[in-house]
Amino acid sequence: MEYLEDNKTETFEEEDKEREEDQVLDSDEVLDSNELNDMQECLSQTDLSNIDNNRAIQQLSLGSMEFPSYTTNSEKEEMLLGLADNFWHQYTHLYPDRKPLFMCPRNECGVEKFVCTTLHPTLLPYSDLYDWDQSAKFVSEYLTMEPLNPPLELPRSLFSSTSVLQKQSGNCFDFSVLLCSLLLGAGYDAYCVSGYATREMCLMDEKRNICPLLNKVEESSWEIPQKPLKKYTVKPPRQLISKFAVQQEAKKQAKMEEALRNEQEEETRLKEDAEKPGPDNLHGLRVHCWVLVLSGKREVPENFFIDALTGKSYATISEPFLGVESVWNHEDYWVNMQDCRNGCKDMKFDLGDPVCWEYLLQGGSKPLLLIPDEEDEEELNGETIQENKTIFQMPPSWVLPIVIRPKEFETRCPQGRKILQYKKAKHEKWAPYLKRDGHVSRLTGYLDTECTQEVKIQDCFQNRKDKLDLREQNKIEQVTTEYFIPGRADSLKVHEYRSLAPETERSMMFYSEARLDGLQRRDEKPVEMTEIYQGRADFLYYRHIVFGKRPKKVAIAGGPTEANPRPILKITERFNRNKEKPANEDVAERTFLLTEDRIQLRCHRKDDHITTSYWEFLKPANLGEKDTPIVLTPETCISYQVEPSEKFSKQLYVYETLVTLQQAEQNSKDNVRKSETEVREILATRAQEEADPQLTISIYDTERNEKSKEKREAMERAIQEERQRRAVQELDYLAPFLAQLGDPEKLTLWQAQKVKEDCLSDMKQRLIEKANLIQARFEKETQELQKKQQWYHQNQMSMSKEDEEAYLDYCSEAMFRIHILETRLNRHKDLAPQKYLALEDRLNKDPRLREPFLTS
């Protein structure tokens, strides 16, 4: 491509002559915020819905406001189009068998634009879009895909990202250009790629792909870790079983498992063969566009692809990508010179390698890896400086700045809803506040590929007043699991149930750190209840309750359930070790057998013991009655003491222990009844919350928060009134000069002229003094820096590394101060005449110095 290089050199000479015109043009294209908003509003009124699937070019009416960059090309752009046209002709001449390049499509106004100038690097003010994965997810959700038509040809047009965002739809090229612009603005080394891909990727067909949300490993909760076996653990008794019989049974079992495994593998293979897509007659010919991210910037470890249609990332050797024709960014354009028979597996993405990639401009960010010939080495070395001065630079983007309003960013999906179909799964998304119950996502899993039989439904919620975050429904087992974020009054964290009716099987988990009783989990069955605690002062961590059948009583219709409570048969409580008590007196487990009037105690085991102390009490019938003698028999207290003590055998100790245990039993019964009441209240509250779901609105959401909006308007009115009041009470600038004359009610013509001259003279003097002060500080800083530099040159050879670093830090700070002073001085010189003229104008308009208020 030698002719292309000659053509570049000819254009370099014309570039110097046009540089001044380009600077004027660039300065004219700088828009302030009001003009930008007007342009965006006019562009949003452009009717883009009439463009058919073939994306036929139409001369669109952009309203009364003209967009020079959209409707015309600058001289620099025309020069670039000439270079691209020359490059394209040479390429088609040298490689007639290759497909044409995607270089100069038409925009929405029917004007040819080079693809590099369509990219507009933009960093939006949203932290979510600073990372590539969130940016790709946003683009894939915000836009609706339009397939290329025909799928074998490059599109004849490429719209600006502002038009694509307004229309909220586009083809793969529109998706990739928008995503690449966002990634470039976020600091990634990103490129658009024009090439070929599989049918499923080009058509965004994910019906044979597993949903990425289903690939996440579900965290197993509440699994009791198995304790490791200790060295002196008692071994189980030896089983007198024939080893030969065991071996034969193991072989038989292995054969059965192998046969079953082979059968399952064959069944899986048949299913996969049935689910495989049919042959594609256009395989390898379907045009596609995606994004390439090279390693280096933003700590990217290796190169990877991003499919902008789905937002997924792939390795550069992935099979869905079948070939690459060209890549480009906002600085240059590269054509692939490598063989793509094996797809992208063997490709190298070193864009500075001229053997693998042919560039359009040499001014790109990628250094050129060339080995000059020996005979041309001296000539090249002599011309390096001249060539660097004449490299053609890519003109600025013709696209308006990409703007996404907060409401649009929050809505994401077109019309606030989007449906994605996967293999045996369907994913539905909604914008926040679109649905009355705060529903934002639903993932439905199916048993068959036709998606007719539901297996599992996962619903996500946002902004719920009841703090509901996620609901999972298992359709096979008929189990519903709800997850809540912190903030509920009952501190509910997880609720797993089959029915919302009380006294049925359910499991509740709580935020224990937010509860006074430290309740962490409550499992309930029709006749049982188990509670797990954490961090209690009484060391209780486990309570198990067994209920009996409710006695048949005549109940009032609609009356409360607690009028006929379930009888409590047994309460078992377990406690952690209390180091302040001896192990022989520290209760580990306490069991109340209410129907038998028996209480069982088991103490903790000491570290050097293998048994524990055990107590069993039989409550006397008249225990707790006053003025009634209590008879303690040997059956009243049965115990086994690891370390016997005399006090344990005294009847007074037994009596006091019985009284204490009776009170503890009553407290446990009261706590059980409170737990039953709390469960009923939680179920009633949940039923009411589901019947009438309420949403919360953040105080920072100015669009939806009416109270915040009214308060903000009131504050603005108060600020405006305060400004007006201060303006009225502003100090009089003539007061010092009128005081010198005795503050007369009226001035003579001579006095008025003198006051005016004195005021202007004082203003002039203060402006001069301020300029002299800034100038003196500027000269002082400059002299000190010069002295420091002279000192450095004199002592440079004997200075340590720390002294050099300190000197460099001082120079940096000094240069910063000098720059600030110079800027302030220049600004003062520019503003001083304006301030003087403004004061003179105010004096001329002051009624106290004008004719009606003057005396003769």
UniProtKB/Swiss-Prot annotation:
It comes from the Eukaryota. The keyword Cytoplasm applies. Residues 1-11 have a biased composition (Basic and acidic residues). GO terms for biological process: flagellated sperm motility; sperm axoneme assembly; spermatogenesis. InterPro entries: CEPT76/DRC7_peptidase-like_dom, DRC7/lobo, DRC7_C, MORN_DRC7, Papain-like_cys_pep_sf. Residues 1-30, 255-277 are annotated as: Disordered. It is found in: Cell projection, Cilium, Flagellum; Cytoplasm, Cytoskeleton, Cilium axoneme; Cytoplasm, Cytoskeleton, Flagellum axoneme. Residues 245-276, 661-733, 764-790 form a coiled coil. Keywords: Cell projection, Cilium, Coiled coil, Cytoplasm, Cytoskeleton, Differentiation, Flagellum, Spermatogenesis. Pfam families: CEPT76_peptidase, DRC7_C, MORN_DRC7. Its main location: other. The keyword Transcription regulation does not apply. Belongs to the DRC7 family. Component of the nexin-dynein regulatory complex (N-DRC) a key regulator of ciliary/flagellar motility which maintains the alignment and integrity of the distal axoneme and regulates microtubule sliding in motile axonemes. Involved in the regulation of flagellar motility. Essential for male fertility, sperm head morphogenesis and sperm flagellum formation. This is Dynein regulatory complex subunit 7. It comes from Xenopus tropicalis. The lineage of its organism: Eukaryota, Metazoa, Chordata, Craniata, Vertebrata. The gene is drc7.
